[in-house]
Amino acid sequence: MKQTYIVDGVRTPIGKFKGMLAAVRTDDLAAMTIAKLLEKNPELDPAAIDDVILGCANQAGEDNRNVARMAALLAGLPWSVPGETVNRLCASGMSAAIHAHRAIMVGDGDLFIAGGVENMSRGPYVISKSESAFDTGSKMYDTSFGWRFVNPKMKELYGTHAMGETAENLVEQFGISREDQDAFALWSQQKAARAQERGRFRLEKFAVEILQRKKDPIIFVEDEFMKPNTTLEALGGLRAAFKKDGSVTAGNSSGLNDGAVALLMASGEAVERHGLKPLARVVSSAVAGVEPRIMGIGPVEASKKALAKVDLTLDDMDIIELNEAFAAQVLACTRELGLVDNDERINPNGGAIALGHPLGVTGGRILHSAALELQETGKKYALVSMCIGVGQGYATILERA
């Protein structure tokens, strides 16, 4: 089997809900990110790309009908380069990268663009069609986030808990206090603020030009969801968002966000042929299913599977990127894995509580961030994992190249 390498990557700044990126079409957002990745690698012939694979969780609006293919064409790739869109909800970006990894492993290609896009601000309203003449039972849903068109049998079997409710279920099951959740959220904000101050995120992102009618374009540079000046007191004053007398709040949760990411992934042969300098090698990956009502525990089982495949343990991991859907969810996972809450390996540059969580993007973002961190620190292994709505977890192990 061939080896797979993450060679390069780039992302947009992450936009807040109805923020700076709300004016940008989802397919354009993906296209400009792909174009920037190619611009960063001028030695590559775009026609040599074997496939473009993007994750996207919504796909109800401008991201419909295979946004990866649309974005590839809009980015200027020749029509001979194909494209595929994958959907594993919160882990869509990671799934896209592992799709590329598997294709490289079995010899189906040597050069791939993988990543994801999500513009939750632009998720459309959708309405069901009438089932019969004069039927007044049509329903309308906001597709930005959450369940829609639920199968009654699904609700009967597993319930349709909102994501925040699944976090509250973990709070109850693992006895996680509000104070611990807020402390973790503050830690995420502080780490992200330090990373921003030292220019760490400049290694990941590019400035987005947002066109204005009859005005000069706006240049969007900095992640806008971050709250670097928050305090424990401010976090402690927020009301529970999902359950009366609950402890999961807007402050200790990730947000609804917009963005795009693109990774250049290559086989060892392609690295040599094109003179590329890889960041990290994909060592192992695994996906696992868990009970939907506690979907946030998914990274535990996925991580165990990914580690076992290659006879590694958590002690071998130098960096642990665990997506912060909710502070409660991260703490449930770390405690179940036997880690202390403030293990210095966890999300060294902050996570989604600070930066935001554009669903189709985050998996690709944290893979790239972990690969860069391995290079910057000279460390060997990173474990990158995330929970997934409806009860799954995904994990990938990287080794510094």
Region annotations inferred by a language model:
Residues 1-26, 145, 150, 231-297, ...:
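Condensing-enzyme catalytic core mediating Claisen C-C bond formation in acyl metabolism
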